[in-house]
Each structure stands twice: as structure tokens, then as C-alpha cells.
Amino acid sequence: MSIKTDVLIIGSGIAGLFAALKISEYADVILVTKKNKAESNTNYAQGGIASVIDPNDSFEKHVEDTLIAGAGLCDKKAVESMVKEGPDRIKDLLEIGTNFTKKGNDFDLAKEGGHSMSRILHAKDLTGKEIERALINSVEAKENIKIYENAIAIDLLTEHNISGKSESLSNNKNCWGAYILDSSNGEVLKIIAKATVIATGGLGQVYLHTTNPLIATGDGFAMAYRAGVEIGNMEFIQFHPTSFYSTKTNSESDGHSFLISEAVRGFGGLLRTKDGNLFMENYDLRKELAPRDIVARAIDNELKKRGDDFVFLDLTHKNANEIVDHFPNIYSTCLKNGIDITKQFIPVVPAAHYACGGIVVDLNGHSSLSRLYACGEVTMTGVHGANRLASNSLLEALVYAYRCANSIKEFINNSSTNIPELLDWDDSGTLTYDEKVLITQSVREVKQTMWDYVGIVRSNLRLERAERRI
């Protein structure tokens, strides 16, 4: 079955939804999402979204903080674009009804690791969920946006799929949409579009321990790679220093670790070894407020040195009412797991959290393949370099989704709409449901291998072993 549209968007996180909203102002949109429309990495983002709001803050300071965190590998122009356009994109969120937490008449701006100023807008500790709510409401109100839920993108439509041709991937020059699996009935749709946007989010589920939901399996990276699209900086996987340590199995925990937000350390949380000793002063002068990569490596080193499974995050010295007010979700979730964070230390471990690399795009979200755009975590804009600054991810997604939408408008207005005859999906050589056990076992092996050998601290020996096993 073939369906035609102006723009196909793959993914329903902040990047995909915001791009859809803006593109709908001039074109018809089909948005496909792997599960339900609210299931995305955005929905699990707790801490907030960084932007220069405080009059005492400045673009220059935010840019500098981002460049420092990125370890000299950021694209300064990309960083400056994100930072300078950030306040306008925050206004866009406010206009569609996003409710950020306030202190009096002003926004309650938090400070997180690596930031020199308080510039994190948040909605308690459920920021991503609130942004997702506002975006979904706005998108659903648009008659020219059609959402397909439980629809899994399989592969991009390129020259390789032209009827009557047998092109190699190296000859791919255009993208005309994608093959989409309707998981409710097993049918594969061919969605043909003038422009396609990949906004599929991250790949944390490639690792044994991750803060990402089950859907974050790196589909967008893989599709682009198979189509010959340029990919970059994939070695830079950010590990969040503090995910909740649980003795539950992977299935019991729904396949991902509960995130203990960066904002908890910004609020004054202290890291302690299992015997109660503070240790961050041994690693960085900023202690608990050092960037994520430094804190994650410090915790990893302490765990390996002592043979422990976790360290503690301590909030017990802070006012109990303020803790509950600032972190209602973290408080209630930990309480369900037997930890009262106002009185007890929180057991935490690092977990795979964010991909700093991805599909290489320019400042307008255009990939190396004509008609193919990308935005959000699946991309390499150059903003994050080797390490993302806390709360820059939602900002980058917003700014570059907006730029992406503007670029597509110009492209559609000025380009030919001649689309070739494209082949229907051919499932020969694929596994059937009767052989699902083979897939399940392979997934387990990959996750364990990636965690053991391609984790926080790597060596040539470990990487070579991982390559052989995979």
C-alpha cells in the first residue's frame, strides 16, 4: 500500500512534533511513531531546557559553557545559533501552553552541572512530559497533520528502491520517504514524500543499562547508515552519572533505569561512597557540579576501585518540603522503591543516556542525502562535541527542528516534485515471528557486549573484542 504526502516525519519527541507543527503551516504532514505518540525520550526528560532568560546571564556565557563541556569538539557556529535563537523558541513553547515552574512572577531557573549561571527552565521534575503534552495538543489540533501510531520505520526510499533499477547504496542521491511497518497488523506501508525528516531520538537501548525507554534502539541512525548517509561522532555516547540503582531485573524495570535528574545535584545533592565518604573533590574543583562526563567517570572509577555496585546521592541535609516540591516525580518513584529521599541516601549508578553524534546535518538540518532532513538527538549538528551540556538537548531539538522546517519550506517551493516509481517492500530474507528467540538472544548479547567493552571507559583491547563479538 502506498501513501503520498508533502513531508514525512519519523518520530514524535520534541524535535518531530515541533517540526510537524511548523511544517503544517505550509504543507501536509504524516508523522509516524513507533509506539504511542507520547512515548519518546522527551517524555522522560526531567531536568529542563537551558536558555538565556535571566538579565544577568548572557549568550556568551551559555556558549562558553557549552564549548567547555564539549571538550573542544563543538562547532561554534552551531552552538551560537542554538543559544541565540533559544529564547524565541522558549516563547514558542509558552504560546502553545507549556507551563514552566515559576517563583513569584519569574521563572524558577535552576542551575545544573557545567552551567555558570542559573538558566534551566523546568516544570518541576517532569519538564519533558509537560513539553510533550503541549506539543501533542497543538499537533492534534492541526487538520493537515496525520499521526500513525505503532508504526515502525524500516528503511528509507532511495535510488536503491527505484523500480527496474539495481542501484548500489553509493549511488543514492535522494530520499523519497520510507517503508513503514504497521505493527498492529504486520502490513508494510510505502509512504512517499517530497521531503523526509528523521527525528527518531536516541540509541540507549543498545546498552545493558540506560535511562532511555524501550523504543530508543537507534533506528534512525541505522536507516540513515544503510542508505549511505554521512554519520559522525558516534563514539561520543554520554553516560548519565546518576540513574537509580535497582535490584529489579530488566523486564521488571521496563527495560530502562529511572533517571535521577542533574537538577538534584544542582539543588545541592552530594555524592558519597557506600561508606558515606564524599569523593567528587578528588576529581574536579566543581565537585558535584562538574559536567556529566567527569562525574560519570568519577563514579565509575570509585565503583571499580572499591568493587561496589553503586554510590549514594545525598539530599538529606536539604529541607524536606523543598525536596518534595522540587522533585515530586523522583520522590514518589524512589518511595515506591523503598527509599525516602528526604531521609535516606539514593543508590545511583551511571547509565547510557544520550548520543552526541549521529546523522551529520548542516545548520538547517539537511543531511548528505537530498530531500532527507534530521533533527534532535539522532543528529550531529556540532552543538555537543564530545559531551553534551546538561539541558541543552531539548533546546537543540527545538532550535534545529525550527530551522529544519524553514529549510524544507524553501526546498519544497523551489524543487521539482517528480518522484520515480518505487518498489514495494520485499520481506525475503527477514526473520519470521517463529524465530523471534533468535532476535531476543542477539539483542541481549549486543547490550551486554556494548556495556562491558564500549562503556564509560574504553581501551583498544576492549573495542577490538567488542567488534569481534558483534
Model-derived regions, located:
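An anion/pyrophosphate-binding glycine-rich loop and adjacent beta-alpha core
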Residues: M223, V229-D340, Q344, L398, ...
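Short hydrophobic core segments
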Residues: L8-I10, I191-T200
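Glycine- and aromatic-enriched mobile tails/lids
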Residues: M1-T5, K22, N36-K37, A45-A50, ...
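N-terminal Rossmann-like FAD-binding beta1-loop-alpha1 element of flavoenzymes
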Residues: V7-L31
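A glycine-rich dinucleotide-binding beta-alpha-beta segment and adjacent secondary-structure elements
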Residues: I154-N174, L181, H326-T379
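Glycine-rich active-site loop/strand segments that organize a redox cofactor
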Residues: S51-M82
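Glycine-rich FAD pyrophosphate-binding loop
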Residues: S24-Q46, P55
